[in-house]
């Protein structure tokens, strides 16, 4: 699993049980040698030198760690592109026609369709709202970490049932409790 810094350099432990971080046991992978790999991706790495420290290049991305990114839309020329909140995602994402449902400055959830290290294509799957609004930023944080902002129907139904039967539930519970 490759770990990419904000500056774009990747590090990968020489072995699974090696300590994580920038230790001498890590293989250093320069940004131009990541070949489209992103932070957390499971990759195959080829060792290309060992002195003064191990250096390598990504041969193959085995599995993407993440396919959805919270982004902010900005205008480039006559089209909107999405810039990821995660500074380790190095390029703007071309969201094509899916940008029609949003406007410049909106926070959006983008599904990554392709990324080769220099160009990225994706599609907007959710417009979160205008950047800077408290509710929007809170939802963006939740989505960035892979959680949903929507509750499943069965949870919503249970919440409605509790609301309807609130008084009965309270009176039943009070009888079961003992004050000390």
Provide a role label for each language-model segment.
Residues 1-180:
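Charge-lined substrate channels and their catalytic hotspots, especially those that engage the 3′ end
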């Amino acid at each position: 699993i490759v770990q990419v810094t904000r500056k774009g350099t990747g590090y990968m432990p020489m072995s699974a049980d090696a300590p994580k971080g920038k230790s001498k046991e890590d293989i250093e992978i320069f940004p131009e040698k990541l070949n489209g790999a992103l932070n957390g991706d499971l990759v195959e790495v080829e060792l290309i030198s060992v002195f003064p420290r191990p250096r390598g290049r990504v041969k193959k991305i085995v599995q993407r760690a993440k396919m959805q990114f919270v982004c902010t839309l900005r205008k480039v020329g006559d089209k909107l592109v999405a810039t990821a909140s995660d500074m380790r995602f190095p390029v703007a994402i071309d969201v094509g026609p899916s940008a029609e449902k949003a406007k410049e400055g909106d926070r959006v959830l983008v599904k990554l369709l392709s990324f080769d290290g220099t160009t990225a294509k994706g599609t907007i799957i959710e417009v979160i709202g205008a950047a800077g609004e408290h509710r929007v930023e809170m939802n963006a944080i939740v989505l960035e970490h892979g959680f949903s902002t929507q509750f499943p129907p069965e949870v919503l139904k249970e919440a409605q049932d509790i609301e309807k039967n609130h008084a009965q539930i309270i009176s039943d519970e009070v009888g079961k409790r003992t004050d000390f």
